[in-house]
UniProtKB/Swiss-Prot annotation:
Belongs to the bacterial ribosomal protein bL21 family. SUPFAM superfamilies: L21p-like. Coiled coil: none annotated. PROSITE patterns: RIBOSOMAL_L21 (PS01169). This is Large ribosomal subunit protein bL21. The keyword Transmembrane does not apply. One of its GO terms (biological process) is translation. HAMAP family: Ribosomal_bL21. It comes from Anaplasma phagocytophilum (strain HZ). GO terms for molecular function: rRNA binding; structural constituent of ribosome. The gene is rplU. The lineage of its organism: Bacteria, Pseudomonadati, Pseudomonadota, Alphaproteobacteria, Rickettsiales.
């Protein structure tokens, strides 16, 4: 059985025992979090698309930061160059149960 969950404005396809990286959640390591399920499916492909029909229970494994992305802006012939980096704070979750 798998589900499509939404957190941080993004959607993830998960099944039990999956480990996913999501945007930072305010939960401590080892805590359980409940993610709302947009759709749940059985292994044969049948399922429901109701948001109220299911939920996904996950455990916080760790907090980390994503890889750095470089933002470089330049205007040719004007000696205008700006270089910035960004690292997003992430939470690593292990899916415990899909309901």
């Amino acid at each position: 059985m798998f589900a499509v969950v939404e957190t941080g404005g993004k959607q993830y396809k998960v099944k039990e025992q999956d480990v996913i990286k999501v945007e930072l959640l305010k939960a401590g390591i080892g805590e359980k979090v409940l993610l709302k399920s947009l759709a749940t499916f059985n292994n044969d492909g049948s399922g429901s698309f109701s948001a109220s029909s299911g939920s996904v229970s996950a455990e916080v494994v760790a907090h980390c930061r994503s890889d750095k992305i470089i933002v470089f802006k330049k205007r040719r012939r004007k000696n205008y160059r700006r270089k910035n980096g960004h690292r997003q704070n992430m939470t690593v979750l292990r899916v415990v149960e899909v309901r």
